């Protein structure tokens, strides 16, 4: 297989192997006097019609603002914004976002103001810089971390590129954790593993996700990490011989079928090996699938032809085939996944995809923008560069996928869940869960957490549908509401039209999605508050009559406003609710 170059969507002709294996943000300028050159080169390849002069201006400003600063590594501080902008350029971001990467620390760490940034570079760059700056202002304690993550979600719901810049910032900082105190590095690594890496995964940014996981794993579990490194190294020779045999046989089969492809093998990441050991309960000696094979072809038809060739040579492992081309993940990911019984009876995991799919798999939302208007707010989530719009128009494969819906759902959670720690817990739970894909009766795909139930489905469709759920059909059959849904199920919800319809507390024992759980709790909280207000009003009225006090005179709206103010309550209903809940005694109102 003599593959040398390949046209990649939105990119100039580049060497296929270099594209498939290149690490983000690691190209260093050959000219130390012009460190911006590789960034501009990559940015130009992605956005040939864009004016790149903003990059020169942003770099000059960053140099001025950071001239007296140094990193903890001892390097000039400008190294960091250059690295962040290089990562953003490699992701395919436009010059506006790359410029924001160059400037992202100026407002936070220097005397440069946001107003100055806005005047010099415009509202979009200033907005991105402001969004990233606000995410760095809370650093101490669990509650502060939870509030920071809440701010992150709000910022990315306004413009998802804020998160892309923050992820690039986190990647480069993670590469330099060895220069900071161990306790600080471990705190950042835990936050990264729990939140930032899963967020990158949800946005389809596998290259970012994988590196963040590896760097965090190394800091959090250094002993285990080093043990796995040594164990993998011991098998390296045997692994390479085995991998060479597999690649040769696949190439031979594809050549016979006249399928033009780029076939590559790679060792599994250390963190993924560790996860296999934990999930499967095996020690390293019993983990055989230490390598993965990837086949990249030109067309979807070639994907299935290559799959046929692979399965003709090796038997597939039952239950290990996934067709994410026919049913893409909601983060835009598309590929065929299969595990086969390879030479020597050892399992081999194989991914098959097109070049367009490969770019989306590595760079996710950064590679394929899908913009939508926020109907409630009447504003765009973000404004694409011209070449972003062109790329989106030319690629219709995933035109029906609304990949910003999940982000907007998170933004809704922030307003629905006042407690930041509770919100962070729900977010971690949602990010950490695997997914199941089911259908509405009209054929729309709904993504739910693994082991989700019809009640989770109902709340995913609409909150009111969830509240009014009284039954469910799965694949045409009536089922209990706690039934576990499987991939491909068609779910129909039966709802009540009664004015008194509402959820059951029992549902909290089996729902899996944070949204369903939060909505059910909110409903009962609201119901309980209404009951408490009525109970408090009745209790106060009875107490006043028992003491022969003039109810009609003392319980006027004007009088109650004064009472609430004297007792530091926001309004009269809050006073009644406190009495009804037993938080305050009616005697307080007589003094």
Language-model features: locations:
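Internal insertion modules embedded within essential enzymes
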Residues: 16, 32-36, 114, 122-125, ...
């Amino acid at each position: 297989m003599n593959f040398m170059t390949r046209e990649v969507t939105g990119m100039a002709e580049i060497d296929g192997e270099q594209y498939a294996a290149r690490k983000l943000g690691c190209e260093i300028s050959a000219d130390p006097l012009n460190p911006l050159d590789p960034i501009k080169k990559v940015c130009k390849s992605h956005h040939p019609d864009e004016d790149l002069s903003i990059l020169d201006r942003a770099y000059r400003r960053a140099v001025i603002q950071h001239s007296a600063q140094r990193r903890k590594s001892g390097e000039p501080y400008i190294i960091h914004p250059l690295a962040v902008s290089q990562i953003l350029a490699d992701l395919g971001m436009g010059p506006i976002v790359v410029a924001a990467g160059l400037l992202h620390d100026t407002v936070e760490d220097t005397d440069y103001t946001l107003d100055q940034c806005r005047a010099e570079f415009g509202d979009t760059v200033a907005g991105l810089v402001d969004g990233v700056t606000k995410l760095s202002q809370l650093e101490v304690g669990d509650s502060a971390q939870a509030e920071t993550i809440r701010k992150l979600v709000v910022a990315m719901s306004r413009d998802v590129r804020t998160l892309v810049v923050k992820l690039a910032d986190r990647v480069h900082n993670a590469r330099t954790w060895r220069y900071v105190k161990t306790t600080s590095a471990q705190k950042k690594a835990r936050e990264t593993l729990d939140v930032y890496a899963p967020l990158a995964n949800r946005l389809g940014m596998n290259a970012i996700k994988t590196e963040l996981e590896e760097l965090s794993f190394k800091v959090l579990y250094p002993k285990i990490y080093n043990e796995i490194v040594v164990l993998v190294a011991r098998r390296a020779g045997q692994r390479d011989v085995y991998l060479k045999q597999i690649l040769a046989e696949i190439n031979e089969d594809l050549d016979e079928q006249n399928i033009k492809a780029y076939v590559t093998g790679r060792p599994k990441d250390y963190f993924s090996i560790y996860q296999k050991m934990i999930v499967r309960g095996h020690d390293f000696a019993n983990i055989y699938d230490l390598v993965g094979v990837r086949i990249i072809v030109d067309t979807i038809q070639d994907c299935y032809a290559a799959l046929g060739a692979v399965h003709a040579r090796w038997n597939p492992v039952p239950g290990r085939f996934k067709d994410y081309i026919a049913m893409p993940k909601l983060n835009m990911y598309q590929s065929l996944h299969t595990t086969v019984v390879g030479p020597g009876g050892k399992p081999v995991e194989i991914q098959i995809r097109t070049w367009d799919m490969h770019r989306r798999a590595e760079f996710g939302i950064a590679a394929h923008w899908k913009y939508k208007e926020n109907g409630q707010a009447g504003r765009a989530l973000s404004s694409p560069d011209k070449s972003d719009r062109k790329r989106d128009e030319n690629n219709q494969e995933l035109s029906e996928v609304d990949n910003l819906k999940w982000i907007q759902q998170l933004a809704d959670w922030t307003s629905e869940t006042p407690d930041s720690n509770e919100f962070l817990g729900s977010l971690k739970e949602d990010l950490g869960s695997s997914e199941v894909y089911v259908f509405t009766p009209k054929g729309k795909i709904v993504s739910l957490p693994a082991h989700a139930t019809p009640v989770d489905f109902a709340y995913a469709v609409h909150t009111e549908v969830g509240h009014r759920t009284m039954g469910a059909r799965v694949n045409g059959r009536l089922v209990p509401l706690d039934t576990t849904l499987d991939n491909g199920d068609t779910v129909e919800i039966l709802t009540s039209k009664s004015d008194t319809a509402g959820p059951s507390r029992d549902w909290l024992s089996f729902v899996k999605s944070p949204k369903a759980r939060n909505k059910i709790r909110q409903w009962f909280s609201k119901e309980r508050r209404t009951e408490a207000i009525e109970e408090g009003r009745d209790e106060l009225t009875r107490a006043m009559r028992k003491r022969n006090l003039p109810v009609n005179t003392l319980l006027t709206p004007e009088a109650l406003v004064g009472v609430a103010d004297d007792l530091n309550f926001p309004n009269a209903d809050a006073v009644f609710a406190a009495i009804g809940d037993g938080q305050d005694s009616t005697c307080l109102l007589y003094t």
